Amino acid sequence: MAKNSLVIGGGVIGLSSAICLLEDGWDVTLYSTEFSPNTTSDVAAALWYPFLSAPVEKTDNWGSRTYDILKLLTADENTGIDMTQTFEYFRNEQSDPTWMSTVD
């Protein structure tokens, strides 16, 4: 029996997620009010990382897989995806996030 999924969003994350699910044998329905070239992904920069996600044992894994896919997409200039090092500044000292070791 086929696994069914609904992906909401036609931007980079939504489309990438839909492709991964299809490649894994899922039946995918994609819903979005806009598609390229009218998505936020087409005109805006994005900051991506697993944010306030749990359980860590699972989210670090999917975060790492997502990062790897986004990194692959940077090889094709037609995707418009570029990775840039960023810095976050906090008022108080923060410990490194659990997912930090899963990215380069």
Predicted regions: what is each one?
Residues 1-13:
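Beta1/beta-strand and adjacent pyrophosphate-binding region of the FAD-binding site
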Residues 8, 31, 89-90:
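Short hydrophobic segments within beta-strands
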Residues 13, 40, 58:
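Short, contiguous, pocket-lining structural segments
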Residues 20:
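Rossmann-fold NAD(P)-dependent oxidoreductase module
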Residues 23-42:
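Glycine-rich FAD pyrophosphate-binding loop
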Residues 46-104:
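Dinucleotide-binding Rossmann-like beta1-alpha1 core, especially the glycine-rich loop
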